[in-house]
C-alpha cells in the first residue's frame, strides 16, 4: 500500500494507492469524513472501504483533504476539498487508462464531496455513500442522480440524519 504525494490545487496531497493487478480493472476513489472533526483517510470506515475495493481487484486510492495529515492547505468548506478530489481523480484515471468503470465512495462529509464530483464527472459509473449528512449539507443537486449507487446509513444514527422531513422515504433495510 504505497504512499503517493500528488500536486494539488493548494500544494501536496497525501494519498494511499493500491494498483489493481489486472489491466483495465475498475478504479475507486475513497473520501473521508469532516476534516474539522478529525476525519482523515485513516478513519476506520474510510480504511474499510479502501480495503474492500482493493480486495475486489480495483485500483483504489484514498487521500487526505487539504490541511489533514501531510496534505497542504486549510479547510475550505467543501469548495477546495472538491477541487482536491477532482485533482486526485485525474491522477487515478491517468494511472488506469484502460479502466472502463470509475467509482466514488465517501463517508459523511466525503459522501457530499463525492456526490458533487459525480455530478461534474460523467465517467463516474457508481457510488457508495456511508452516512451522508443530509441534515448538514444540501444534496438537492442530485435530482436526478446520474449513476447507480448504494446509500448505507444506520437506523439509529443520530449524529448524521438521512432525511429531515416528517415523512421519510421508503428504504430497503438489510440485516
Regions found by a protein language model. Give the residues of each.
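Short beta-strand/loop motif that positions the catalytic acidic residue
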Residues: 151-153
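N-terminal cap/lid segment of alpha/beta-hydrolase-fold proteins
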Residues: 1-23
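Alpha/beta-hydrolase active-site loop
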Residues: 76-95
